[in-house]
């Protein structure tokens, strides 16, 4: 079943939340940056997989969160080959097939999905939405929660579980010299 949601996808209690990524290990802007801050352990797994060249377009990288409550997985969905490039509809189409297979394998009942490749990726939301509708309708036993394009939340309300680096007097002195 496909439903539409609004709000911050990072707060969704679906079994899995989709994170749109590239294949080179950079989460520097947009939704990926929000995921990097909210789920730092996911970033470590993703970065290591990219360094090993095992993240490729068309294939999902599910990362278990080892949580007792949903979400249980972050599923990294490569929508771009490189962070400097644009997304391609073929990456979305191939990725949706892989996502359906992962949903079956992981026995997911619900998945929260952002506007794949439609923000910084540059794809038309209408074209992406059509692919999502057509592909995911084939697996109606999963609740697919679609988050259409919307403005980014303010920095003050974004989840941030990253640790602040310790600023010692010595480090401050060195920075003061620069």
Where are these regions (language model features)?
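Macrodomain-like recognition of ADP-ribose-binding/processing modules
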Residues: 1-178
């Amino acid at each position: 079943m496909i439903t539409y949601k609004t709000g911050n996808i990072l707060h969704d209690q679906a079994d899995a939340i989709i994170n749109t990524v590239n294949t080179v290990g950079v989460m520097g802007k947009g939704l990926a940056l929000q995921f990097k801050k909210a789920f730092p352990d996911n970033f470590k797994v993703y970065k290591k997989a990219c360094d090993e060249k095992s993240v490729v377009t068309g294939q999902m990288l599910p990362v278990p969160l080892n949580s007792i409550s949903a979400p249980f997985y972050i599923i990294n969905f490569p929508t771009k080959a490189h962070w400097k490039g644009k997304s391609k509809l073929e990456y979305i189409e191939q990725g949706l097939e892989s996502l359906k297979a992962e949903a079956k394998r992981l026995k997911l009942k619900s998945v929260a999905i952002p506007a794949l490749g439609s923000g910084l990726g540059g794809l038309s939301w209408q074209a992406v939405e059509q692919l999502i509708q057509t592909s995911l309708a084939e697996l109606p036993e999963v609740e697919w929660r679609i988050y259409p394009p919307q403005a980014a939340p303010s920095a003050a309300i974004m989840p941030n579980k990253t640790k602040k680096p310790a600023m010692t007097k010595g480090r401050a002195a060195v920075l003061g010299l620069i």
